[in-house]
Amino acid sequence: MLTRRRFIQLIATLFGSAFATACARALAVPTAADPTAIPSRTATASPTATATVTSTATSTPTATPVPPSPTPTFTPTPRPTDFVSVRGDQFYYRGARFPINGFNYYPRLHPWRTFNFGEWEPAVTEQELKLGASLGANTVRMFVDFNASLTGTLTNTLPDAVGVIPNRQYLASIAEFIEIAARQNLKVQFTLFDGMDWSFYAPEKFYLVQTYLYTIIPMFANDARLMCWDLQNEPDRAIRTVGANIVIPFFQRVSNVIRQLDPRQLQTIGWIDRARTQYFPDLDKYLDFWCFHFYDQAANLPDLVKLYKSKTTKPVLLQEYGLATGGPGPDGANTEQDQAAHYDSVLKTLDENKMCGSVFWCLNDFPVGLAGNPPLQTDHPENHFGVFRLDYSEKPVARVLRSYWKPSS
């Protein structure tokens, strides 16, 4: 079990004495792990809904360290208006409405391994984020692989409390990414726990998750260059595997820990299955806005938008959508013109319904043998979702995005 003293020693070794001192100050005040203890900071009303899941949360082991003070690490103290905020069902930034114009990002040659040891290439990322910004984007979504953040590789691990402290080099690469994004005026959606083993959802393992969060969140807390904490990508799979009675309380606890460490920053989760709206009542007071992913025919989007808007008064962001322009099978049997028409239809639907924005999948095409976790060794539609081809030339869909996003010259 990780004791208070051992936690401070580890932090001092890995991150230096100043950060360890901040941890020691915070460890003097214990806090509750009750998943219902901290309400969301948005003031929107929850709609009436049914089919809620019964929370079966159990208490968290008491030996878990209390989080360090959320002191900003990389930037001066920002003004409140420097953060993206929520009013009603829209986002605001510096006093004005801020429609999310975003893209999901993996490097062209290192998909699913952005920050892995030996694969992080900041100059390439700068070049690629410039391409996204040239479309009129104001937001980029990136992914922190849970295993890679500990070991530098995608190797699946089941660590103890010592082993769940994120690697210093990996965190430095994330910090560099945020700096690069800021130079392109891109807010960052910071997606946590990608690729995490199912066993970590169990209540008895939550002290490990807390230890992880107590290290990674303070490094980027109070940083207005972030748009939000995305608690996990598509946890629908976890619900199917370990059950909603485990997964929903897990995210309630995660939200509370992050809210304590970084109270200003927005929080969300991206769902792919429309059935997950049944859990909105259980998470509505924890999350500041909702996200959904859409890979269906564009003609089916209007009904889905109406469904989501009927379930919450908070912003509902289309966080993934796209169309592959190659690869075997029916999912790859689309032309680049089909892709452009699909985007046009999707963006038109969002505008007509006064939605808060969208984040397309994805910026670049990928070479065969790299995309996926584990990588797909033969050609697949996953390699062909990009708005930019392998040589960085634009597909016709780029013109569609610019027509809606209207980038400044």
Regions found by a protein language model. Give the residues of each.
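Active-site clefts of carbohydrate-active enzymes
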Residues: D236-R240, Y308-Y343, L363-L370
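Hydrophobic, well-ordered secondary-structure elements that form the walls
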Residues: S358
